[in-house]
Amino acid sequence: MKVTVLAGGVGGARFLLGVQQLLGLGQFAANSAHSDADHQLSAVVNVGDDAWIHGLRVCPDLDTCMYTLGGGVDPQRGWGQRDETWHAMQELVRYGVQPDWFELGDRDLATHLVRTQMLQAGYPLSQITEALCDRWQPGARLLPATDDRCETHVVITDPVDESRKAIHFQEWWVRYRAQVPTHSFAFVGAEKSSAATEAIAALADADIIMLAPSNPVVSIGAILAVPGIRAALREATAPIVGYSPIIGEKPLRGMADTCLSVIGVDSTAAAVGRHYGARCATGILDCWLVHDGDHAEIDGVTVRSVPLLMTDPNATAEMVRAGCDLAGVVA
C-alpha cells in the first residue's frame, strides 16, 4: 500500500511515526511481518517555515521529520537532535550576531551546512533532502512541497513603534511566541512557485492520502498554498482522510488556535473540517476524524470520532488504522 501524508511540525512527524508503526516501516520494520515492498510511505512536507539563518538554509519541518523518523530527534523538545550542544550559538551571541532568538545546535549545523552548500551548487531541495536522508535512513520519502521559495510571513503590529509590518514566520513563532497583534498570513513566493514533481507524483500514486493533525494554517495551509498541490489533491484517485488537530477547542500542541483566529476560523474540529471542505464540492476532504467527544457535521464528508491523542506510536498507529477503515482501505 502506498500512503502519502501532508505533514508539518512536530505533530506531523509524530503522526508519520504512527503510520510507520502500522505498516512496519523504518524503526518498526524489524518487528513487522511486512516487507519493505509491501508498503511505501511518502510525506509531502511544509517548507513555509524555511528561512536563512546566519547564512544557512534552515528547513525546520523537513529536519524534524528526518530526525524523528531516523531515530535522532531530541525526545524532550520533539525537534532538533538528541544530545545536542550549543557552543557555536553561544559564540555567535558573544559576537553580538543577530538573530539571537533562533538557536542552532552544533549537530544541527552540519545538516544546514550540507544543505546550503548543495543549494549553492545548484541542487534542488528535493534532491538535497534525499541526500540528507541517506545519512538518517528515515524509512519514508520526505518530499518538500516545492523546490521553490514559498515562505510564510506574518503581518503584525510592531510592539515597539506600533507600525504594521510583515515578519518571517520564524520571528513571529520563535521570537514573539505569537504574542503580538496579528492581522494576516502571506505565503511569499507562492505566485512564482510550483509543486515539486515528486510531491505531485506521490499524491497521484497513493492508495490513501492523509492530512496529519498539523497546524491547518501554517503547516497544511502553507502546503496548500503551493500552486498545483490543491489541484493534485482534488484530482487524486485515492481517498483523502484528514485528522483534526483540535481536541475540545484546543490544539493538540502548538498555537493552531491562535493561527485559526487570525483567519477567522473557530478553534473546533468541525470548523477546521469545514475550512478544508468536501472534495465533492470545492474542498479536499473525503473523510474527517475527530477526537472522542467532539462532534462535526460537514456536508459531503464522512466523519467519525476516535481517540486522537498521539501518546506513543502505538496509539498513533490506531489513529491511522481508523482512517484507513473509514476510507475503506485495507492496511
UniProtKB/Swiss-Prot annotation:
Its EC number is 2.7.8.28. One of its GO terms (molecular function) is LPPG:FO 2-phospho-L-lactate transferase activity. Keywords: Magnesium, Transferase. Its cofactor is Mg(2+). It catalyses: enolpyruvoyl-2-diphospho-5'-guanosine + 7,8-didemethyl-8-hydroxy-5-deazariboflavin = dehydro coenzyme F420-0 + GMP + H(+). GO terms for biological process: coenzyme gamma-F420-2 biosynthetic process; F420-0 metabolic process. 7,8-didemethyl-8-hydroxy-5-deazariboflavin binds at residue 63. Pathway: Cofactor biosynthesis; coenzyme F420 biosynthesis. Pfam families: CofD. HAMAP family: CofD. Inhibits intracellular mycobacterial growth by inducing apoptosis in infected macrophages. Induces macrophage apoptosis by triggering reactive oxygen species (ROS) production, release of cytochrome c, and activation of caspase-3 via a TLR4-dependent pathway. FbiA-mediated apoptosis may act as a host defense response. Was identified as a high-confidence drug target. NCBIfam families: F420_cofD. Belongs to the CofD family. Homodimer. Catalyzes the transfer of the phosphoenolpyruvate moiety from enoylpyruvoyl-2-diphospho-5'-guanosine (EPPG) to 7,8-didemethyl-8-hydroxy-5-deazariboflavin (FO) with the formation of dehydro coenzyme F420-0 and GMP. This is Phosphoenolpyruvate transferase.
